[in-house]
């Protein structure tokens, strides 16, 4: 869909610093075709350009559901929930600017210690066993991925049927069930 294309290209440019020439090549290669259900869909005219796009999109998909991303969001949510339960902040406070919210977190010694601990996180570790005396979580996530249509000599086909390499990488990404404990790593 157009919105998925927009955020994929936007992130490719802003987060992953994709060269402008590659982004232009991707946009210039698109056309509207009919998918398997005879519905209009954006398609690629050339497999080489679809390959550039799918590498970018899969990299983003993996990044957005990485252990680091899932853990940091869950740990922050749990920290804010605890702050709310302790009366340190309200839901309305979350609509204020970050310095105000951080000031509230620092006003309570228990929450301030948790906040300072959160700020020291440099990554994550994971395993099948939950470590003792350690904040660890199992976190599922919705996976988004793209298998675009590409023009071939046989007509329009999904890129996974054209590129065995992409098909394998996409299958591996989709197979991850997040059935592991994740906890913070500190330097």
Name these PLM-found stretches.
Residues 1-187:
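Histidine-centered, transition-metal-coordinating active-site segments
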């Amino acid at each position: 869909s157009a919105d998925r294309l927009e955020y994929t290209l936007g992130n490719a440019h802003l987060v992953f610093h994709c060269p402008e020439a590659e982004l232009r090549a991707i946009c210039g290669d698109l056309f509207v075709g009919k998918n398997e259900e005879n519905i209009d869909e954006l398609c690629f005219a050339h497999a080489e350009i679809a390959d550039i796009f799918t590498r970018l999109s899969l990299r983003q998909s993996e990044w957005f559901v990485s252990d680091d991303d899932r853990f940091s969001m869950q740990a922050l949510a749990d920290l804010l929930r605890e702050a709310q339960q302790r009366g340190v902040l309200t839901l309305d406070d979350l609509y204020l600017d970050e310095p105000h919210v951080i000031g509230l977190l620092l006003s309570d010694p228990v929450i301030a210690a948790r906040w300072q601990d959160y700020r020291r996180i440099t990554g994550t570790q994971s395993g099948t066993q939950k470590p003792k005396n350690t904040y660890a979580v199992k976190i599922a996530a919705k996976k988004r991925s793209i298998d675009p249509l590409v023009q071939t000599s046989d007509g329009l086909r999904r890129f996974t049927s054209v590129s065995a390499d992409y098909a394998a990488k996409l299958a591996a990404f989709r197979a991850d069930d997040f059935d592991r404990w994740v906890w913070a790593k500190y330097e």
